[in-house]
């Protein structure tokens, strides 16, 4: 039964209302510093911890709750007579509810003007100590670290004569240990990222010790293959626009492969500015098999589907604009696993209501960039910054005698944007705001070029006058000759080969335009 609570919070969201409800339930309130002042100013009866312990705060507030009267009241097991006798001997009442959140260390070190002393002063000591004490003794103590749990605890107290059930206490305790682990991990990440001069501005993006924090969203029936187990975890630092922010509107549970492919689709489609028109991306096995722009979602979808209607079967489809009813009716004619959009109109929702197996994911558009990309290797983790560089037309360098005309330049920029999301080696034919042929994942660039042209031929699409993007340089002229023979009149590629001069000479010989970006987009 909760008779006494200690409240000490940095995030004061909802704390006054929560304390008022506790007071109404007859709970004695203890508090510290700014929290105590806020509660007192709000007319609530509250005792300062310094008055409660008989020992003043000291060292500029560094020591205020590190006292036996606080920790004894939290840690004592109510089922052990010797514990309760010790409390009685030293006149220590039990503390049955602890509400604490920590100094804002992460927010402090995120500021550009942060200094090491600023960071150090925002390392909480008393807060984590109390939290861990209460979480350890969760059989007898309710502990809250998240304001979102205030209502749950109050509801249980009202229903159970001021008591909170063990299952809730256990859940809240595990939440505390996860929170303090993340907090300590953030401190370690920051301090081990500092260089010899210990300056905030000179810190490394890659700390000596890297701690990562993820919350489990769901366990899955299986992983990439049926004999593999799997789960999906959300990064606690998920940025705006990330796939992990999805809301599933309908459909079966997402599988491992669904989520992997959905991420590829969403990252590709949101790279196109919705203000410039609708974009549609169709993904199969993490590769785009159709990408297109249109005046609306329907036009973008129709063009993307034409690129490779065979591979689109059972694919993942993403839009960067709301999916309306007209486009939904067209999409519903094919077998699709997952549909992603910033929003779905009521009409579109109605279309798919009859196809409950189709998973609809709504994700707010956003251009947040993850801090890291990861690749697991045996015994280790490769960590890099994301491939977030988007080359602007002004950065391109024309290396051939012939310059691309405005239409070709538009097609080249579109092709280059798509190639970034195709597995290497990648060759992408484009024209008129749509992909015409995609060659992905081949060990030689010339084979990717051949496959891309064959794909276009199989789809009945002409490559005459098309633009081609290559995610990395042409090591020889053979790949260039394949795309020109297929009908391409302009090429965009990074450049940087030892044989650049030979490849450029071949482009001049064939009469095409070539621009180089100086940026490579390998994707493995």
From Swiss-Prot:
The keyword Hydrolase applies. One of its GO terms (cellular component) is cytosol. Its EC number is 2.1.2.3, 3.5.4.10. SMART domains: AICARFT_IMPCHas, MGS. Keywords: Hydrolase, Multifunctional enzyme, Purine biosynthesis, Transferase. Pathway: Purine metabolism; IMP biosynthesis via de novo pathway; 5-formamido-1-(5-phospho-D-ribosyl)imidazole-4-carboxamide from 5-amino-1-(5-phospho-D-ribosyl)imidazole-4-carboxamide (10-formyl THF route): step 1/1; Purine metabolism; IMP biosynthesis via de novo pathway; IMP from 5-formamido-1-(5-phospho-D-ribosyl)imidazole-4-carboxamide: step 1/1. SUPFAM superfamilies: Cytidine deaminase-like, Methylglyoxal synthase-like. CDD domains: IMPCH (cd01421). It catalyses: (6R)-10-formyltetrahydrofolate + 5-amino-1-(5-phospho-beta-D-ribosyl)imidazole-4-carboxamide = 5-formamido-1-(5-phospho-D-ribosyl)imidazole-4-carboxamide + (6S)-5,6,7,8-tetrahydrofolate; IMP + H2O = 5-formamido-1-(5-phospho-D-ribosyl)imidazole-4-carboxamide. The keyword rRNA-binding does not apply. GO terms for molecular function: IMP cyclohydrolase activity; phosphoribosylaminoimidazolecarboxamide formyltransferase activity. The IMP cyclohydrolase activity resides in the N-terminal region. Belongs to the PurH family. PANTHER family: BIFUNCTIONAL PURINE BIOSYNTHESIS PROTEIN ATIC (PTHR11692:SF0), BIFUNCTIONAL PURINE BIOSYNTHESIS PROTEIN PURH (PTHR11692). This is Bifunctional purine biosynthesis protein PurH. It comes from Cupriavidus necator (strain ATCC 17699 / DSM 428 / KCTC 22496 / NCIMB 10442 / H16 / Stanier 337) (Ralstonia eutropha).
């Amino acid at each position: 039964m909760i008779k006494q609570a200690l409240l000490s919070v940095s995030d004061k969201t909802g704390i006054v209302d929560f304390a008022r409800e506790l007071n109404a339930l007859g709970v004695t309130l203890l508090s510290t510093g700014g929290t105590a002042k806020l509660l007192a100013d709000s007319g609530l009866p509250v005792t300062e911890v310094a008055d409660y312990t008989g020992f003043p705060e000291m060292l500029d507030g560094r020591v205020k709750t590190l006292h036996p009267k606080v920790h004894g009241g939290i840690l004592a097991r109510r089922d052990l007579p010797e514990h309760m006798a010790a409390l009685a001997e030293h006149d220590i009442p039990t503390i049955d509810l602890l509400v604490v959140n920590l100094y804002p260390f992460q927010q402090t070190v995120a500021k550009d003007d942060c200094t090491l002393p600023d960071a150090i002063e925002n390392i909480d000591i008393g807060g984590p100590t109390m939290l861990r004490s209460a979480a350890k003794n969760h059989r007898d103590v309710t502990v809250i670290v998240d304001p979102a749990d205030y209502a749950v605890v109050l509801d249980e107290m009202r229903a159970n004569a001021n008591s909170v059930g063990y299952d809730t206490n256990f859940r809240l305790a595990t939440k505390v240990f996860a929170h303090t682990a993340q907090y300590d991990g953030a401190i370690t990440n920051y301090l081990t990222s500092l260089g010899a001069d210990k300056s905030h501005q000179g810190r490394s993006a890659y700390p000596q010790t890297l701690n990562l924090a993820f919350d489990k969203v769901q366990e899955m029936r299986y992983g990439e293959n049926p004999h593999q187990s799997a789960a999906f975890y959300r990064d606690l630092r998920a940025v705006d626009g990330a796939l992990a922010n999805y809301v599933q509107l309908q459909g079966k549970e997402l599988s491992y492969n669904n989520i992997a492919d959905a991420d590829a689709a969403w990252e590709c489609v949101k790279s196109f500015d919705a203000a410039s028109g609708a974009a549609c991306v169709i993904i199969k096995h993490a590769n785009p098999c159709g990408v297109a722009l249109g005046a609306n979602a329907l036009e973008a979808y129709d063009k993307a589907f034409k690129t490779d209607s065979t591979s689109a079967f059972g694919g993942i489809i993403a839009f960067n604009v709301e999916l309306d009813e007209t486009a939904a009716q067209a999409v519903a004619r094919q077998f699709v696993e997952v549909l992603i959009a910033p929003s779905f109109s009521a009409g579109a929702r109605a279309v798919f209501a009859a196809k409950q197996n189709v998973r609809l994911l709504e994700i707010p558009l956003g251009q947040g960039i993850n801090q890291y990309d990861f690749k697991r290797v045996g015994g280790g983790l490769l960590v890099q910054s994301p491939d977030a560089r988007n080359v602007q037309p002004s950065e391109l360098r024309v290396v051939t005698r012939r310059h691309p005309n405005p239409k070709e330049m538009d097609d080249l920029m579109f092709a280059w944007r798509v190639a970034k999301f195709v597995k290497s080696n990648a060759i992408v034919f484009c024209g008129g705001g749509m992909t015409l042929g995609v060659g992905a994942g081949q060990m030689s660039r010339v084979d990717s070029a051949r496959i891309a042209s064959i794909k276009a031929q199989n789809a009945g699409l002409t490559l005459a006058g098309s633009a081609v993007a290559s995610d990395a340089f042409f090591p020889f002229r053979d790949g260039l000759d394949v795309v020109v023979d297929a009908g391409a009149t302009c090429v965009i590629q990074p450049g940087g080969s030892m044989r650049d001069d030979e490849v450029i000479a071949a482009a001049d010989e064939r009469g095409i335009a070539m621009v180089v970006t100086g940026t490579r987009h390998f994707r493995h």
